[in-house]
Amino acid sequence: MEDFVRQCFNPMIVELAEKAMKEYGEDPKIETNKFAAICTHLEVCFMYSDFHFIDERGESIIVESGDPNALLKHRFEIIEGRDRTMAWTVVNSICNTTGVEKPKFLPDLYDYKGNRFIEIGVTRREVHIYYLEKANKIKSEKTHIHIFSFTGEEMATKADYTLDEESRARIKTRLFTIRQEMASRGLWDSFVSPREAKRQLKKDLKSQEQCAGLPTKVSHRTSPALKTLEPMWMDSNRTAALKASFLKCPKK
């Protein structure tokens, strides 16, 4: 699974996931399923914000150019992927600036158009079950919840899906691709089932050989989705972004 993750996700996403796990004392080489889940969640968060801007009239627009107009403001502030101290600093700054209620838990995004924090969920289970778990944990009507599954299902607070259908379809397609590629390598069952995951972990610890058929290089389709994770007050510099790829994992 670790080799699969490193080959199928952008290096910046992998690096952020490793830092997040190490911050909580977790080892990506051992807890490989969690490693894959964190990378997937990060990518969905970046894809959620990709191409979405607010123009000078305050209207939400989609710009797919690699060189966005400097007058445009990013619609979403990405909070997920930052270390906890910086993440809370950004949240506090948003709350002080907008007057929105401070959440009890760190959200994933802030929507400047909708004036709300957003919690993104990616589940291997039924979307409604995961949605209820999120809602029970957050216990706040102020934070918007949007859940995606690997089967193309989604669920959002008050059926408000925030994004246009095409943008959501990109996310669903990517998740379905990840599932198919995991399945083709015999990794999906262990990713879904804790019991199977434990069995797979024992097997992986016995053999550290690289997954057969996985190449050492990957090709990149550039996208403006992965922006440098700077504080919100440095927004003017964010257009000088890291180019990232949402890769379709290479076939065997």
Swiss-Prot record:
List the GO molecular function terms.
RNA binding
**What residues does the record give for site: Important for efficient shutoff activity?**
K202, K203, K206
Keywords for the protein's UniProt record, in alphabetical order: Decay of host mRNAs by virus, Eukaryotic host gene expression shutoff by virus, Host cytoplasm, Host gene expression shutoff by virus, Host mRNA suppression by virus, Host nucleus, Host-virus interaction
Alphabetical GO biological process terms: viral RNA genome replication; viral translational frameshifting
Q: Does the keyword Hydrolase apply?
A: no
What residues correspond to the site Important for efficient shutoff activity and nuclear localization?
R195, K198, R199
Cited InterPro entries: PA/PA-X, PA/PA-X_sf
One Pfam entry for this protein is Flu_PA
Q: Does the keyword rRNA processing apply?
A: no
- Spell out the catalytic residues: E80, D108
Compartments it resides in: Host cytoplasm; Host nucleus
Q: What does this protein do?
A: Plays a major role in the shutoff of the host protein expression by cleaving mRNAs probably via an endonuclease activity. This host shutoff allows the virus to escape from the host antiviral response. Hijacks host RNA splicing machinery to selectively target host RNAs containing introns for destruction. This may explain the preferential degradation of RNAs that have undergone co- or post-transcriptional processing.
Domain characteristics, as noted in the entry: The probable endonuclease active site in the N-terminus and the basic amino acid cluster in the C-terminus are important for the shutoff activity. The C-terminus acts as a nuclear localization signal. The C-terminus is recruited to host protein complexes involved in nuclear Pol II RNA processing.
Q: Provide the family line.
A: Belongs to the influenza viruses PA-X family.
Q: What is the protein's name according to its record? A: Protein PA-X
Originating organism:
Influenza A virus (strain A/Turkey/Ontario/6118/1968 H8N4)
